């Protein structure tokens, strides 16, 4: 069976041109973009990249992709990243890999955001996939209760029987909204007003395009 993630990831690498400074997302689909870019760098492509996670940083270094800090530049030409859900308005849920804060910082520092995914990530309404929320660890139970007051079911993300810790030293609360997320803008705003919430996995109002791997080939949105 065709690997639809690989199809989308490698296709998106074609948007990267010589001399660009780009953002590299995190996850199983972007993995294929980074692999493709590594091959192109070996063939002479000259780029600089900002990784959105330690995982991506390690992979990029293994492939000899030159890395820089976001502090060294004003704006990125392009960021390529994956998504856990994509609705008809190209609003996203991201953060399944736990890198949502750095992913959002990099995405909002880019002229253009290309989202890559397989067709299973397309939805009419966001919210079937749990919405990740990054929170500080201090008094996290109080923050969780305030999040629950918005009508969602919450779970502290775990890894190896311990709380999952982000690259920023924070925790992740995964939230299920029983009636889906019908107004992502309002939900994002309400969550960000809760003290202790650092960032949400809702990526909205961004200049983006989506590259979707389907059984019939690539579709662009």
Swiss-Prot record:
Function: Catalyzes the reversible conversion of ribose-5-phosphate to ribulose 5-phosphate.
Pathway entry: Carbohydrate degradation; pentose phosphate pathway; D-ribose 5-phosphate from D-ribulose 5-phosphate (non-oxidative stage): step 1/1
Assembly mode: Homodimer.
GO cellular component annotations of the record: cytosol
Reactions accelerated catalytically: aldehydo-D-ribose 5-phosphate = D-ribulose 5-phosphate
Protein name per its UniProtKB record: Ribose-5-phosphate isomerase A
Residues involved in substrate binding: 26-29, 81-84, 94-97, 121
Keywords (A to Z) from UniProt: Isomerase
Pfam families named among the record's database cross-references: Rib_5-P_isom_A
Sequence intervals crossing the membrane: none
Residues forming coiled coils: none
Family: Belongs to the ribose 5-phosphate isomerase family.
EC number(s) given by UniProt: 5.3.1.6
Catalytic residues of the enzyme: 103 (proton acceptor)
UniProt cross-references to Gene3D superfamilies, sorted A to Z: 3.30.70.260, 3.40.50.1360
